[in-house]
């Protein structure tokens, strides 16, 4: 199943329509169900323009969310309410997916944006947690029985500019934004040696790649990839 997300980011409004159409049609030809969430109008009243520390600035007038506001683990989906996904978006997904046998959960761990440098499932029963945002007290209940790797020691590297200036990465934790290839293999930023050593303790093999410019301008490896073709059956991992 493919769901086109109703992004709250005006600059990305036509992204799915124009950049990814060929990919979506290929998935459709391969048998995927293709759905589109209601397109938001993104009027000014969708946003709070004043400075409100640690609170989401995206309001709840229309359905809005980005794909990385969701962590999917088999039948269970965890939705992060933040600046890139609101509660109305969660309600829409819940009404759509729960009749199909999925279970929807929501969290409000931090307000900034996406979720894929915060909670990173590595394999059934093992999850990487950003310990600067997630603690044993606020850890989502669906991961209660899972083993957890608590980590926030990312190597922060920005990009040098032509005038010898410096542009920091989009997040100090973007190094945790990795792609899980299988239950024992991840692709991650080659600078993240502390994270590689930690993953090795759990039998996770790391494939390091250079990805600095993307991490400065847009996002990490998980941000820049989307695994549409998957093998296996729909299972429950959080019972």
Question: Which sequence ranges carry the predicted segments?
Answer:
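The feature marks the mature, well-folded catalytic cores of soluble enzymes
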Residues: 1-239
């Amino acid at each position: 199943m493919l769901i086109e997300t109703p992004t709250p980011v005006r600059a990305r409004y036509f992204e799915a329509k124009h950049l990814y159409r060929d990919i979506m049609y290929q998935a459709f030809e391969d048998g995927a169900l293709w759905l589109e969430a209601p397109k938001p109008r993104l009027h000014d009243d969708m946003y709070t323009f004043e400075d409100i520390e640690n609170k989401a600035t995206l309001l709840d007038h229309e359905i809005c969310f980005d794909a990385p506001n969701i962590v999917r683990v088999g039948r269970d989906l965890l939705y992060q309410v933040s600046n890139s996904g609101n509660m109305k978006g969660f309600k829409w997904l819940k009404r759509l997916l729960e009749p199909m046998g999925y279970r929807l959960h929501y969290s409000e761990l931090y307000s900034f944006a996406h979720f894929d440098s915060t909670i990173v499932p590595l394999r059934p029963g093992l999850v990487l947690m950003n310990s600067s945002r997630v603690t044993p007290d606020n850890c989502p209940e669906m991961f209660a029985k899972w083993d957890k790797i608590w980590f926030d020691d990312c190597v922060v590297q920005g990009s040098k500019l032509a005038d010898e200036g410096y542009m920091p990465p989009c997040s100090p934790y973007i190094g945790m934004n990795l792609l899980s290839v299988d239950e024992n293999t991840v692709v991650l930023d080659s600078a993240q040696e502390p994270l590689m050593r930690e993953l090795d303790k759990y039998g996770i093999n790391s494939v390091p790649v250079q990805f600095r410019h993307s991490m400065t301008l847009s996002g990490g490896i998980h941000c820049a990839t989307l695994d549409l073709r998957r093998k296996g059956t729909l299972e429950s991992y959080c019972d």
